[in-house]
Amino acid sequence: MSNRKAKLSFENQSVEFPIYSPTLGKDVIDVKTLGNHGAYALDVGFYSTAACESKITFIDGEKGILLYRGYPIDQLADKSDYMEVCYLLMYGELPNKGEKEKFVRTIKEHTSVYEQVTKFFNGFHYDAHPMAMVLSTIGALSAFYHDALDITKPADRELSAIRLIAKMPTLAAMSYKYSIGQPFMHPRRAMNYAENFLHMLFGTPYEETEPDPVLARAMDRIFILHADHEQNASTTTVRVAGSTGANPFACISAGISALWGPAHGGANEACLNMLRKIGDEKNIGQYIKKAKDKNDPFRLMGFGHRVYKNYDPRAKVMQKTCYEVLDAVGRHNEPLFKLAIKLEKIALEDDYFIEKKLYPNVDFYSGLTLNAIGIPSNMFTVIFALSRTVGWISHWMEMMSSPDHRLARPRQLYTGETEREVISLDKRQA
């Protein structure tokens, strides 16, 4: 219980609410009993509302800090791999050697999907968006795994989480292969998580190929950097769906649906499209001028962030990774990448961008990196969903194990008509 109180006065009454202090971040006022006093709180978009208590991820947007279970994101990207980060997000601690080996082995045992699942793809139109295919097949997995759908059992919840993390790259790669008319590639247990994904994306049955280690490491970092980001729109969607008692496959499918929205998961694709629109280095000045004009609808994508008012901590890691990939594939001198590097330099030196703290964000570099690897832009959000699956399922597991777990039921400020009588059709005015 909290000894500190916040007092709210309204309608000739004064009500006290407990104030809770987090281990990091701003204090939280618990107003859940406000409705008992004849009023509700209005916070459109939840920008000042903590909808849950969580121990998973912390963000300080003012200072440019992102922590997974207390570990800085740049250290995890440098010293760990995605499988370690998955273990960390799910269980709260980084694994030791034995724990990691067991976890990786378990993931690899669940990477394959039923043959009936692969037949789902034949029902999609030839030009279906990969996100539509992934969303549908993830939701359909609940039809195949009845053995672990008792969400009241921790062991069932854990097994479902493992299956989702393991099968997501397989289904993501299948969505890409189907979209380009190539045969599916089966996962190979000898490869690590990122290598396996690249193998299933770009491999063919006609030749044995090994993914470039630089590209595999880059993909692993992309997975790490996008693994979780606190209570964003898609994570909140997963939690709300989970609060109803829906199975985890349905909940993750709901999260994918939310992520598909261009305001959430499409930023790196939008950034790449912007670069193509600018077209040439000689046009940068014109578009910089447009970006500074409040009356111009043009927005410079990939710069600044809704949460981070400082440098996005993921961007520094992604910048380094981007340059490593460009070196590995020899694409530094292609017009698109030369344009991006020039734009980055101008933005980092221009007083307007410095004053507004419009630094290049993770989306600016991740879109370039994925493009350099050879991944088309319609797969960018799929890869985002693949990366974020562990974050979603970790939040779902945390919520399901919480004694405060309850059905989400927001209120509203109703501004519609007051009660009125129904008039028969023949008496209604034209």
From Swiss-Prot:
Q: Which GO BP terms, alphabetically? A: tricarboxylic acid cycle
* Pfam families, alphabetized: Citrate_synt (PF00285)
Check the record and name the Gene3D superfamilies matching this protein: 2.20.28.60, Citrate Synthase, domain 1, Cytochrome P450-Terp, domain 2
Q: What is one cellular component GO term in this UniProt entry?
A: cytoplasm
Query: Reaction catalysed by this chain?
Result: oxaloacetate + acetyl-CoA + H2O = citrate + CoA + H(+)
Carries keyword 4Fe-4S? no
- Regulation affecting activity: Allosterically inhibited by NADH.
State the Gene Ontology terms under molecular function: citrate (Si)-synthase activity
Active-site annotation: H305, D363
Give the Enzyme Commission number: 2.3.3.16
Domain of life of the organism in this record?
Bacteria
Pathway assignment:
Carbohydrate metabolism; tricarboxylic acid cycle; isocitrate from oxaloacetate: step 1/2
Family, per entry: Belongs to the citrate synthase family.
Q: Miscellaneous notes for this chain?
A: Citrate synthase is found in nearly all cells capable of oxidative metabolism.
The subunit field of the Swiss-Prot or TrEMBL record says: Homohexamer.
Designated name of the protein = Citrate synthase
- Gene that codes for this? gltA
